[in-house]
């Protein structure tokens, strides 16, 4: 077991280039502007990528407009956005790397069991970035910070899938 922990930390070191303090602050400040828009974020992802919506049995085949005001949708959106918020809260501090790795590893394991592909994770990423960039003050620095942060997280995720 220790071998796997050491291997995982080596992977983190190889993949993740920690965000600078300025980058982490920029990701956190832009996320703070949208993090309470859980339903809108998930609705935007589902609208842009219906194949992602199809992976959720309770939402598959339904019009996004007809489900986005339901309690089930709000609950699920809260879980997804809550996970993103948890990861973002941990960035910018290298001592949090093991916690990030654990959370991302759990996400990978649960989604691998459901057959979720890297392509679908990349679609989610694109939908998330599209929503954030359309709803905050977005500039080259924000784009660079988000790209670096998401590259780190998705690198960990894909290594664990």
Swiss-Prot record:
SUPFAM superfamilies membership: Globin-like
Annotated keywords: Heme, Iron, Metal-binding, Oxygen transport, Signal, Transport
Misc remark: There are at least 12 different components in Midge globin.
Organism: Chironomus thummi thummi (Midge)
Segment forming the signal sequence: 1-16
Gene Ontology molecular functions: heme binding; metal ion binding; oxygen binding; oxygen carrier activity
Pfam families, sorted: Globin
Subunit annotation: Homodimer.
Gene Ontology CC annotations of this record: extracellular region; hemoglobin complex
Family membership noted in the UniProt record: Belongs to the globin family.
InterPro entries: Erythrocruorin, Globin, Globin-like_sf, Globin/Proto, Mb-like_M
Keyword Metal-binding: yes
Residues the record lists as binding heme b: 76, 111
Ranges of residues in domain Globin: 18-161
Record-linked CDD domains: Mb-like
PANTHER family, per the entry: GLOBIN-LIKE PROTEIN
Protein name per its UniProtKB record: Globin CTT-VIIA
